[in-house]
């Protein structure tokens, strides 16, 4: 049997990444050019800065990924690319590069939803068992997804306002922590106690929706009022209280989803899946079903996860033509108009 190699491109936000996947789940390379240092002084991602950085490094990422994998363009079977959701300028850089490379090398083009990539990152460590439930937690999304079979995604719950990763970064900015703040908040939380008892929005309601704007506002008010009065703030307790509220909400909604859908596996993915507090709570509280979380290197944005999702689309011959465009607000159940089904 001839080996299959997929080159994947990810540029939806502030990471430029190109990866090579061999067959179903073997990542031969996963080159990531991070822009975190460039965005730190702004306290968040600046879209124009992100796009310019993608342009500067993407060609080098292609070269490095092929070299690290030990293959050439002639060995490839397809090119995959994130076409949404994300920052439109950033997406267009990756799309242009992927389409040009695919066209020049006479390779089929596979469009991949960025969030499907996060979900399928777990395929690298073990085969996924269907049907499954996925909790996707990142800087831009918080979603519960029911996946009855590979490539078939149904959103059953999502945030009504802030994504959980966004809330982490916003409260981190209030405390003067370095962007991105999630890791530092997690570390501080392990040293503190839940003394502030922040609200857990909609935690007892029957639906599977999330809300973090009220929690964020409550945190900011506590911090602001203490500063105004000159009261002492214990950062460890602030972080522990914030994280306890976040995790209570995530766990409560995930448990409800598992009780309502016939899942054989729970996948937790996205940048916030790197949070040690979340991993600990999942291990303690969800024991009746297998929980799969991608390795830390695959939790953030990377092309490896895009390649892993693309392998499923390749099997279905879900290719796109060269009119494929960026979809910054792409939904999970939305497919490109340019699909060419062979």
Swiss-Prot record:
Cofactor(s), names only, from the UniProt record: Fe(2+)
Places the protein is found: Cytoplasm
tRNA processing listed as a keyword: yes
Entry's Gene Ontology BP terms: tRNA threonylcarbamoyladenosine modification
Group of enzyme by EC: transferase
Alphabetically ordered keywords of this record: Acyltransferase, Cytoplasm, Iron, Metal-binding, Transferase, tRNA processing
Primary location recorded for the protein, binned into one broad class: cytoplasm
Known catalytic reactions: L-threonylcarbamoyladenylate + adenosine(37) in tRNA = N(6)-L-threonylcarbamoyladenosine(37) in tRNA + AMP + H(+)
GO molecular function: iron ion binding; N(6)-L-threonylcarbamoyladenine synthase activity
Superkingdom, natural source: Bacteria
Cofactor note: Binds 1 Fe(2+) ion per subunit.
CDD domains: ASKHA_NBD_TsaD_bac
Residues where substrate binds: 136-140, 169, 182, 186, 275
Entries under Gene3D superfamilies matching the protein: 3.30.420.40
A GO CC term assigned to this protein in UniProt: cytoplasm
Residues reported to bind Fe cation: 114, 118, 301
Enzyme Commission designation: 2.3.1.234
Keyword Manganese: no
Function according to Swiss-Prot or TrEMBL: Required for the formation of a threonylcarbamoyl group on adenosine at position 37 (t(6)A37) in tRNAs that read codons beginning with adenine. Is involved in the transfer of the threonylcarbamoyl moiety of threonylcarbamoyl-AMP (TC-AMP) to the N6 group of A37, together with TsaE and TsaB. TsaD likely plays a direct catalytic role in this reaction.
Record-stated family: Belongs to the KAE1 / TsaD family.
The name this protein goes by in its record: tRNA N6-adenosine threonylcarbamoyltransferase
Species annotation: Streptococcus pyogenes serotype M18 (strain MGAS8232)
